[in-house]
């Protein structure tokens, strides 16, 4: 029985474009914040890293809090759209704040300014916006194929934006003057673009009525729960924990790739190569995302596709290490592209896997926690990306790196090689292992068989709204 279709092509594109706004924040922050603070503002990389790590202490609470608030929201716009819309206003303001540290302030005041701006951006506004955006996957369609398509559209826009930001920002800042004020100008422009696109994206889709989302299900009057109960439901779901771990590893991987700006500048002696490597990463990802929905259908599920993709990614990153020590930039780019091609399918169907993960909680616990379940996306992005950036700062500080020096010691160059060549390979191996155990689709099929739920009723009745 063919599943009911809920979305037009323009709904899918409109939804996917929302990750332009998300990556205006995320790609800009993770790729350039550290180099801005160390080289333009003159702050110590190790101290910045520590402040970022301390900021992450707030994230675990705020992710679950906002996920729970989305689940409890009932408005004319729906559950998630208000949080997506209004959360981004704060994102735009605090993004500019992170890149507008007044150079006239004393050193301590500069650290305080950065910490407050960064914490508000990540722990409050980005959390509310990103969880709501991700939760829309479950709230605007019940069709599993459309969910995979939404994920593909979303990450095509995400990686295109990331590519563009990584490719043009260095030159853009130089054209604006190359100093701290230039970074502020670029941040303002990016924030305005993000605000406009986020608004268009939110208004391009419509959440399904709750009656339709819950059609065919028995209403549970005792389904109300607080943050503590929501947390307990999450940790009981082993697949949620796996996805959280995988998401964190992905963002750690991304932080090390972002640290490539140091590797290109000091090891390869050409900072403009950072933009060229961005093409090698993002174009193959986009190509893989285009074909992900077709491959999911061909292999009758996401598990095999994701696992095989990451086997290819591990091979690619291992060859990048070899090419790096050979000193061959063309080979490094080629193998970087190979690794990215393997990573693409998991990026494209991740939200659909989370929807299946949410379904697993319903089948095992009898509770629906759409918004709370999607907290893993925001939690993983912020903890992984934040800790990754912090680790970059600590490693640079440990190696003796000083941002405003004309030359760097060999220990700093060795550390840059380790961060850019070896750590991404290690993270890919760990992700591959996690994906080898993440067969939530089969787990759900077995549970439905035990409960006597017909296979063709899965999406309409038990697939997460």
Task: State what each model feature region is.
Residues 2-464:
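Membrane-embedded alpha-helical bundles of multi-pass transporters/translocases
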């Amino acid at each position: 029985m063919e599943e009911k279709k809920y979305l037009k092509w323009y709904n899918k594109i409109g939804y996917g474009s929302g990750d332009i706004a998300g990556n205006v924040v995320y790609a800009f922050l993770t790729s350039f914040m550290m180099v801005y603070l160390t080289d333009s503002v003159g702050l110590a990389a190790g101290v910045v890293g520590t402040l970022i790590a301390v900021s992450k202490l707030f994230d675990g609470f705020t992710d679950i809090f906002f996920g729970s608030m989305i689940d409890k929201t009932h408005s004319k716009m729906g559950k998630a759209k208000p949080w997506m819309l209004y959360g981004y206003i704060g994102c735009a303001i605090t993004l500019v704040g992170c890149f507008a540290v007044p150079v006239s302030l004393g050193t301590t005041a500069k650290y305080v300014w950065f910490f407050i701006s960064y914490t508000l951006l990540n722990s409050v506004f980005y959390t509310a916006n990103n969880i709501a955006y991700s939760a829309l996957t479950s709230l605007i369609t019940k069709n599993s194929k459309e969910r995979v398509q939404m994920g593909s559209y979303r990450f095509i826009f995400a990686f295109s934006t990331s590519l563009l930001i990584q490719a043009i920002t260095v030159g853009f800042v130089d054209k604006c003057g190359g100093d701290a004020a230039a970074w502020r100008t670029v941040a303002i422009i990016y924030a305005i673009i993000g605000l406009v696109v986020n608004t268009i994206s939110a208004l391009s889709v419509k959440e399904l009525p709750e009656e339709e989302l819950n059609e065919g299900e028995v209403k549970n009057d005792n389904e109300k729960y607080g943050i503590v109960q929501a947390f307990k439901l999450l940790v009981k779901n082993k697949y949620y924990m796996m996805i959280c771990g995988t998401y964190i590893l992905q963002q750690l991987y991304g932080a090390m790739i972002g640290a490539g700006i140091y590797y290109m500048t000091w090891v390869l002696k050409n900072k403009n190569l950072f933009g060229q490597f961005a093409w090698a990463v993002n174009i193959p990802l986009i190509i893989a995302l285009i074909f992900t929905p077709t491959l999911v259908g061909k292999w009758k599920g996401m598990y095999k596709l994701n696992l095989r993709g990451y086997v290819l990614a591990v091979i690619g990153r291992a060859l990048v290490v070899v090419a790096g020590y050979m000193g061959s930039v063309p080979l490094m780019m080629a193998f970087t592209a190979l690794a990215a091609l393997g990573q693409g399918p998991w990026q494209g169907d991740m939200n659909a896997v989370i929807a299946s993960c949410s379904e697993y909680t319903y089948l095992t616990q009898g509770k629906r926690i759409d918004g709370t379940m999607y907290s893993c996306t925001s939690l993983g992005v912020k903890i992984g990306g934040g800790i990754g950036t912090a680790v970059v700062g600590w490693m640079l500080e440990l190696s003796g790196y000083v941002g405003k020096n004309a030359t760097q010691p060999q220990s700093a160059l060795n550390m840059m090689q380790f961060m850019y060549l070896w750590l991404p390979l290690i993270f890919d191996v760990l992700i591959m292992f996690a994906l080898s155990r993440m067969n939530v689709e089969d787990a759900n099929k077995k549970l439905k068989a035990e409960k006597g739920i017909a296979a063709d009723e899965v999406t309409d009745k038990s697939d997460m709204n």
